Amino acid sequence: MAVTLDKEAYYRRIKRFFGSWKKGDDEFANVDAIVVSVGVDEEIVYAKSTALQTWLFGYELTDTIMVFCEEKILFMASKKKVEFLKQIANTKGNENANGTPAITLLVREKQNESNKGNFDKMIEAIKVSKKGKRIGVFIKDKFPGDFMKSWYDILNKESFEKVDISASVAYTIAVKEEGELNLMKKAASITSDVFSKFFKDRVMEIVDADEKVRHGKLAESVEKAIEDKKYLGGTDPSTIEMCYPPIIQSGGNYNLKFSVVSDKNHMHFGAITCALGIRYKSYCSNLVRTLMVDPTQEMQENYNFLLQLQEELLKELKHGAKICDAYQVIMDQVKKQKPDLMSKITKTLGFAMGIEFREGSLVINNKNQYKLKKGMVFSVHLGLAELNNKMGKKPEEKTYALFVGDTVLVNEEGAATVLTNVKKKVKNVGIFLKKEDEEEEEEEKDEAEDLLGRGSRAAALLTERTRNEMTAEEKRRTHQKELATQLNDEAKRRLTEQKGGQQTMKARKSNVSYKNASQVPKEPELREMKLYIDKKYETVIMPVFGISTPFHIATIKNISMSVEGDYTYLRINFFCPGSALGRNEGNIFPNPEATFVKEITYRASNVKTPGDPSVPSLNLQNAFRIIKEVQKRYKTREAEEKEKEGIVKQDSLVINLNRSNPKLKDLYIRPNIAQKRMQGSLEAHVNGFRFTSVRGDKVDILYNNIKHALFQPCDGEMIIVLHFHLKNAIMFGKKRHTDVQFYTEVGEITTDLGKHQHMHDRDDLYAEQLEREMRHKLKTAFKNFIEKVESLTKEDLEFEIPFRDLGFNGAPYRSTCLLQPTSSSLVNTTEWPPFVVTLDEVELVHFERVQFHLKNFDMVIVYKEYGKKVTMINAIPMASLDPIKEWLNSCDIKYTEGVQSLNWTKIMKTIVDDPEGFFEQGGWSFLEPDGEGSDAAEGDSESELDDETFNPSEDEEEEEEDSDEDYSDETEDSVDSEESADSEEESGKDWDELEEEARKADRESLYEEVEEQKSGNRKRKGHAPLPNPSKKRKK
């Protein structure tokens, strides 16, 4: 996909940047211009220059010089980067339109000698900015390379005074916007998951099996874990990287800094410190924990004291407080409660983080005078080093360290919010193993416990794993609660902003037959008071009260002709207010107050009178035939025009005459260009694809019109697909299409059932071998094509591959198919019509018919654009419910569930009609099981999730019976609906039919006792509602 720049974010941030420069009272405010140079150096991971670029543009631009002057900004970069920066460049006559200085773009030449002219332009701009003497730079950022050297040489020749503005810029960008906070929360969530689901479990396995594992090897395995999708919750692995190599220490050798590297010593089963930081889309997070194996009482007390200090520090980190003051509060507490630990505690208690992992100017120590601001994110970590273990016997047991840290968010009031929600109490990080003497005592007390033996470690492991699973569920629920609040707030704000735009009702097109009398035909039929059809102006002229009156063909609803005796009758019905209109006819007339003709009937004789050249009724017969023809032609044209409505005109395809263009042959296209499918070739050009069929038909798809480019491999499928979901529909085959795909068949779609087969038939084995080779060949060809296209487009277009492991079965249309998530969508491209849902457009997901006794449930997708029809996915297996919830939670999508099917058309109409009233009543909270609204009755009846006894009042019982009856009727009616096409096991037959079949089967089997019992049950049951799942659970 095209690399786009978030212009709104750029304008907001550049205003803040210039605002800090002009209003500041430090060295930053006294500089005359700011120079930021970024070269190419793979060894530099974090730098102020690259951080500023990422903050402004969302990307790192190497070999780029930025000069910020008082009245203008100059960017010098390669031609490709200049094209990218043009998105924010001010056009002529539109300077300062966004309150930001005008931008001048300079193209860097490959030959350094050719860049001198551009260098001179930037030097001249610096000299005329304010006093032109002092320039702000990042002193520590020095990049190698010829281009950077040439620039530094020219800059150093001038007599500019250089001022380091690193701290001031860091303080400016330290306050995170909402979008940045979401990225940091996601990074913290991934860090927490990798620690909880991988590292902690791995350490417990090592302890349980008494393995010998080196710190370095364990750190490498943690780094590899971020490539495994099961630890990332559906996040694209390409957007994730380590902030630093994981640091694992134990056995008396501890250095509580983030610049150290895990050593090659074996892990010792004592105090095991782990520091882990993960970066998501350039934003960092950090987590530090200490796992303790059989900790002594003193070790536990010191650890609890460390947690107490951290809690106290979080309370001090609030808007407006000085960093040094927060530090001093902690030091005073240590001095007061445990003065012996003053020399053991770490010198700094944390630092600010964001695009850079460690912000050196915002460290929590006793010298930092900066004030905290709401929206800042800190890594708060406290450690106690070189602690003595009095009970230690071996050298590695005598010294230990404790280290705890989290990523936290500074709030306006109250304590800072922890973003890395990994439990850290002693019971959560302690691994307690039973001693041999304790096991012997238990054997004497109870012989049954002898079966455990020395496997107590496994029992401890199981307990910890169970606790972790519970923690994951609690974490998911907590996250969903946060999303619910955020959902209502954002939806309310969005609808308020849209309130100003009034929707214009589309009026029915007014068709005027003749603009003046001169256009009316002078045919003899008009003088003879006969019906006349003017094909040119698509008008029927008919006599009304002796006057020839024109009616446009669009006003005629339908016509009918009948012969009764000696007469022929022609009846013409017209469209008029109050009449039933077709779905596509529109129901608003230009002038509804006017007088309308509803119908006209003409009669003509079938008897030929002497002297007449023809039968009088011939005029009506001809009129009937010609009106039908004109009406058909008019409706066809109108349908084509309607298809073209809203079609955005695309740019012309720029053909690349180079014969080495990426090309795939022997592909089919869906939807078909003609009635019969035809093969063709797909070729990538300068700005788009062109598909050419063997007949010569052409379909062009531009890169900038592609919303999702999907590649569906042939693994487990009979076809291999390239699918394009478009931003704006395109026209071909006289219809508009937003989904176009190109595919080829891999194996035989059909199987000859009459063929005699044998297990070791050579032909079959050979055919299977050929199919395997064909699959491999096709997959390789498609992957090569994709790589070439991405290279050709400079990665402006990127193909997404569905995650088959996260897929689930469902029926979005009439048949069941495999729905698979990608990094930005939920898709099925192998069946037609295809199914593509963009996750960014989803407001929330609601699960319907989630009941204990049903095997399937339905999924409703509600979009942020409330006027858009909701998407239903039916008949999803109940086993897929938890994985879907986990995936949605990882994508920050709110989900709810209920036992009944809701009328979504009515719900969405209610919301659109009165959005303010909807959100005043709680918004989407009515979908929650414990929410108020339509689901409250469900929560009191069949959807009771816990096993507590419920004693309703009389009114509630009546309501419950009513709701059960409604649901029972709904279940019976669902047999004929499309939504339950694949769930015949639950709602295929009603209770009476099932009981009748059971009675017949029992009679045939001569089970008289069972027959009597079932007949008794039938008398007692009648038309009872479906059984309560909670009662079934209690049996």
Curated annotation (Swiss-Prot):
Q: How does it assemble?
A: Component of the FACT complex (also called the DUF complex), a stable heterodimer of ssrp1 and supt16h. May also be a component of a ck2-spt16-ssrp1 complex composed of ssrp1, supt16h, csnk2a1, csnk2a2 and csnk2b. The FACT complex may also interact with vcp.
Q: Where is this region: Disordered?
A: 491-520, 920-1035
Q: Where is the composition biased (Basic and acidic residues)?
A: 986-1006
Cellular component aspect of the GO annotation: FACT complex
Protein function: Component of the FACT complex, a general chromatin factor that acts to reorganize nucleosomes. The FACT complex is involved in multiple processes that require DNA as a template such as mRNA elongation, DNA replication and DNA repair. During transcription elongation the FACT complex acts as a histone chaperone that both destabilizes and restores nucleosomal structure.
Assign the protein's first listed, main location to one coarse class: nucleus
UniProt record similarity statement = Belongs to the peptidase M24 family. SPT16 subfamily.
Q: Which PANTHER family match?
A: CDC68 RELATED (PTHR13980), FACT COMPLEX SUBUNIT SPT16 (PTHR13980:SF15)
Q: What is known of its domains?
A: The Glu-rich acidic region in C-terminus is essential for FACT activity.
Its ancestry begins with: Eukaryota, Metazoa, Chordata, Craniata, Vertebrata
Name the residue ranges with Polar residues bias. Answer: 499-519
Residues folding into a coiled coil are 432-500
Spell out the Acidic residues composition-biased ranges: 929-985
Q: Which GO terms describe its biological process?
A: DNA repair; DNA replication; transcription elongation by RNA polymerase II
Q: Which UniProt keywords apply?
A: Chromosome, Coiled coil, DNA damage, DNA repair, DNA replication, Nucleus, Transcription, Transcription regulation
State the protein's name.
FACT complex subunit SPT16
GO MF terms here are: nucleosome binding
Gene3D superfamilies named in the record: 2.30.29.150, Creatinase/methionine aminopeptidase superfamily (3.90.230.10), Creatinase/prolidase N-terminal domain (3.40.350.10), FACT complex subunit Spt16p/Cdc68p (2.30.29.210), Pleckstrin-homology domain (PH domain)/Phosphotyrosine-binding domain (PTB) (2.30.29.30)
Query: Where does the UniProt annotation locate this protein?
Result: Nucleus; Chromosome
Gene name linked to the record: supt16h
Checking Pfam families in the record gives: FACT-Spt16_Nlob, Peptidase_M24, PH_SPT16, Rttp106-like_middle, SPT16, SPT16_C
